[in-house]
Amino acid sequence: MSDKQFIETQGQRLYEALRSARTLAPLTDNHPEMTVEDAYHISLHMLRLREASGERVIGKKIGVTSKPVQDMLNVHQPDFGFLTDSMEYEDGAAVSLKAAGLIQPRAEGEIAFMLKKDLQGPGVTREDVLAATEWVAPCFEIVDSRINDWKIKIQDTVADNASCGVFVIGKQHTDPASLDLAAAAMQMSKNGQPAGSGLGSAVQGHPAEAVAWLANTLGAFGIPFKAGEVILSGSLAPLVPAAAGDRFDMVIEGMGTCSIQFTE
């Protein structure tokens, strides 16, 4: 497909939905022929509009990596998107749903990677990722969809910047060489009650494997990972709906804690 006007029109529609905190019908309803590559270019146009408004790219994310999340969303391959400085909040922050423009947020517990070296696919391996990583930390990614009722296909979520909302990273930073990331156990609670658990192996067998996949996928588009960027590696457990008044806490074995709460 890859019609320039189509790409720009859909990117503009998603950007306006983001800014006005409203949802759209799935793009694939009216454009079933749309490809994942089309969707990626739509997300890039949306990103350029965000950058033009003053936002700065600080990292990248992979999503829909674990089977529970794939089954929940009925999307059976990973998605990918970009993180900007406006999405990041401090660990423990009280996030206003209105100020953050969140519409139908869901919480994900995952592992964040901070890079100390550039990486560019193709050919990036798990070992390359670990060698290029300065530290890992627990992370809450709050995903949000500009698509009605999360009725997404892979093309819809990629176009919508991988359903990115906001994120917080725990204050404890750990050298990944000291950890078995595949065996790292995550426990998440919502308002003091258990809300999810999972192992690092839930994410493509190993979180660094997911990061390598992302490096190679973006490498095909000529997009590198850069030193100083943060990479979110995907949820270790099913997504949990979030609303005003909710507080989420997480602990990952050997990595420390992370928390976020929500207000109107």
UniProtKB/Swiss-Prot annotation:
Please indicate if the UniProt record lists Transcription regulation as a keyword.
no
> What biological processes does GO assign it?
steroid catabolic process
Gene3D superfamilies (alphabetical)? Fumarylacetoacetase-like, C-terminal domain (3.90.850.10)
| Alphabetized UniProt keyword annotations | Lipid degradation, Lipid metabolism, Lyase, Steroid metabolism
Residue spans crossing the bilayer: none
Q: GO CC annotation: what is one?
A: cytoplasm
Q: Which reaction does it catalyse?
A: (2Z,4Z)-2-hydroxyhexa-2,4-dienoate + H2O = 4-hydroxy-2-oxohexanoate
Q: What is its EC number?
A: 4.2.1.132
Q: Which GO terms describe its molecular function?
A: 2-hydroxyhexa-2,4-dienoate hydratase activity; 2-oxopent-4-enoate hydratase activity
Describe its function.
Involved in the catatabolism of testosterone. Catalyzes the hydration of 2-hydroxyhexa-2,4-dienoic acid to 4-hydroxy-2-oxohexanoic acid.
Tell me what this protein is called. Answer: 2-hydroxyhexa-2,4-dienoate hydratase
The taxonomic lineage of its organism, from the top, reads: Bacteria, Pseudomonadati, Pseudomonadota, Betaproteobacteria, Burkholderiales
